Structure formats: structure tokens, C-alpha cells
């Protein structure tokens, strides 16, 4: 008898995973899982873009592009001035129960005014708000962030860490309000490929995996509370998006 994730692993094809090429597993029924390719390798027609300071739908500087069949994030048209123009590219449909997988690597240097923390830093945003609901100058969608990081050559820097813009969650029996929590992943230096998977089961359990190993788990993702409450509205699902934080990926 296979566990849910063991069964999933038997049907993963590495050939489906290109630079930031998303694969989504929908449904948790007992039958054989089936993968759905989110990025078609040709264009961005199934995706919506929101960059800080620009209206939804405007791909400033051709930030998000398709290169040789891969989804690429680049800032070569920014004139070396990022100006905190954080961006996100959203898949057209929301999801609740799924396993999403990507392989990523970093391909260049960030603009000179990029934040230090954003060096070799990207992320998958899950259970997020829609791009249409974001304000013009909003940095990040309310969501759960699965960080995609690369080592900087200075100490340890795990990947698949958990950050929570506009959200909180439960871990080890208590509500966590700390913005970012480090995973147990090792550091990946250089421009090597790294595989990250996220298993999301609605508003219950979420787990991050790096190269097949579980590195962090938590539950009950929820919006930040209001009116003095301790808990917020549970997130049963939402948008999936990929960041642009100044690191070419």
C-alpha cells in the first residue's frame, strides 16, 4: 500500500520540469494521479501579471517571458534600476488540493538597487489573493510563500522556507506570526537546478519538499486576524503565482 506521496512520486516525469515550469497534480482520489502542465512552453496566455506600480496585466520591462520553451524572469530592460517593482505572475485558475512541483535555477545578477535579502531569491505563492484584488502599489499578494533561494557563498541559506505576507498559520500546535521560518533544507550554491514541491490540502496540511525530502510542514493557513481576534479566516485555497523580486531566474 502506497502513501499519497509515494504514489505521486511513481508518476513524476522529470522531463516535464523546465525552468520554472509548473506541474500541478489535482485531486486526491484513490485512482492514479494525473499531472496537469500549467506552463505550455510557448506563451503566457494562461497567466496574469501584476507588478507593483502598474495595473494588472501590464508586463513592465518584459519581466516575465518565454525563452527556449522556459518561463524566465529577467530585468535586462530595467536599466539597472529595480525600484522595488515587485511582481507576480498568476496562473489563471485557483486551486485547493494539489501537489505542485518546479525546478529552478538563477541565471544572472540582480539590478544594483535590489534589496540584499532578495539576492538569489524567488518564490512560489500559494493560497493567494487574485491579481485583480491587489492595490496598485501592493508589494505581495496575501498568500503563503514557498521561498526559492540560492546560496550566496556566505554561510547557510536553506531553500523552501516559509514566509507569510498577510497571513499566518499553525505549526507545532501554535499560531505562528513570524514573517519567515527557515526550513531544514541544505544550501544550494551556484547555478544548479533545484526541485521544490509543495503539497497543499486545502486549509489543513501543507508540506514543502526539496529534491524529494520533506523540509517543513504546517497547517491551517489563514489571513491575518482583524478586530483583535487571534485567528483569521482560514484559506481553503487560492491563486498560485511566481515572484519577481529582482533575481533573474
Where are these regions (language model features)?
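Bacterial N-terminal signal peptides that target proteins for export
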Residues: 3-16
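Bacterial N-terminal signal peptides
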Residues: 15-26
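Carbohydrate-interacting regions of secretory-pathway proteins
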Residues: 28-249
Amino acid at each position: 500500500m502506497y502513501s499519497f506521496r509515494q504514489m505521486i512520486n511513481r508518476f513524476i516525469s522529470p522531463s516535464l520540469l523546465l525552468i520554472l515550469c509548473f506541474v500541478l497534480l489535482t485531486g486526491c482520489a484513490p485512482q492514479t494521479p494525473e499531472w496537469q502542465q500549467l506552463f505550455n512552453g510557448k506563451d503566457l496566455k494562461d497567466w496574469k501579471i501584476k507588478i507593483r506600480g502598474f495595473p494588472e496585466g501590464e508586463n513592465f520591462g518584459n519581466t516575465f517571458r518565454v525563452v527556449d520553451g522556459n518561463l524566465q524572469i529577467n530585468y535586462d530592460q530595467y536599466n539597472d534600476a529595480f525600484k522595488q517593482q515587485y511582481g507576480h505572475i498568476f496562473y489563471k485558475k485557483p486551486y485547493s488540493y494539489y501537489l505542485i512541483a518546479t525546478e529552478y535555477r538563477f541565471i544572472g545578477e540582480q539590478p544594483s538597487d535590489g534589496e540584499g535579502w532578495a539576492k538569489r531569491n524567488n518564490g512560489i505563492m500559494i493560497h493567494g489573493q487574485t491579481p485583480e484584488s491587489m492595490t496598485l502599489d501592493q508589494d505581495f499578494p496575501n498568500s503563503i510563500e514557498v521561498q526559492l533561494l540560492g546560496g550566496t557563498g556566505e554561510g547557510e541559506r536553506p531553500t523552501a522556507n516559509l514566509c507569510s505576507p498577510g497571513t499566518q498559520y499553525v505549526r507545532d500546535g501554535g499560531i505562528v506570526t513570524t514573517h519567515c521560518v527557515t526550513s531544514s533544507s541544505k544550501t544550494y550554491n551556484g547555478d544548479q537546478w533545484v526541485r521544490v514541491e509543495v503539497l497543499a490540502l486545502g486549509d489543513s496540511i501543507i508540506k514543502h519538499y526539496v529534491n524529494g525530502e520533506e523540509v517543513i510542514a504546517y497547517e491551517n493557513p489563514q489571513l491575518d486576524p482583524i478586530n483583535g481576534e487571534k485567528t483569521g479566516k482560514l484559506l481553503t485555497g487560492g491563486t498560485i503565482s511566481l515572484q519577481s523580486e529582482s533575481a533573474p531566474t
